[in-house]
């Protein structure tokens, strides 16, 4: 578990100053959580149910998957809906427009990394 940064520390002050000039570090911290972008991408590729995502990533714990889905939903990157005519009622996840914008950026970053990783 990550520890909280003490308010009196120089690290805290540096992060505060950086945040005043640019929020990229905070964005990268939020989207860089383990499994988060992989889950978002899976949902965008029609792997849209909890159990199906688990099959793609069998080592991903139920607890972490539920937490990441909750975070993606709270950040309006995905939304949850019911699959009609299913008993018991089943849920599916879909990517929002905001989420699709982020996926495009992540794919561009991936292409950039592929291009420059050996240089």
Residue ranges and their predicted role:
Residues 1-31:
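N-terminal leader segment of winged-helix/HTH proteins
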Residues 19-64, 85, 90-92:
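N-terminal helix-turn-helix DNA-binding core of bacterial DNA-binding proteins
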Residues 29, 41, 73, 104, ...:
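A cross-family signal for key residues in well-ordered alpha-helices
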Residues 65, 69-72:
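Basic amphipathic alpha-helical segments that dock to polyanions
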Residues 76-83:
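A short, conserved structural fragment
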Residues 85-106:
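Basic, amphipathic "hinge/linker" alpha-helix immediately C-terminal to the N-terminal HTH DNA-binding motif
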Residues 101-117:
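Short, solvent-exposed amphipathic helices
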């Amino acid at each position: 578990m990550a520890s909280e940064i003490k308010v009196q520390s120089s690290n805290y002050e540096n992060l505060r100053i950086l945040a005043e000039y640019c929020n990229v570090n905070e964005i990268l911290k939020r989207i860089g959580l383990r499994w988060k972008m992989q889950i978002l991408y899976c949902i965008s590729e029609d792997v849209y149910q909890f159990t199906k995502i688990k099959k793609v990533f069998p080592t991903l714990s139920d607890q972490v998957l539920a937490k990441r889905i909750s975070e993606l939903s709270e950040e309006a990157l995905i939304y949850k809906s019911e699959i009609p005519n299913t008993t018991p009622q089943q849920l599916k996840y879909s990517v929002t427009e905001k989420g699709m914008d982020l996926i495009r950026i992540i794919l561009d970053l991936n292409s950039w990394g592929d291009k420059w990783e050996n240089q």
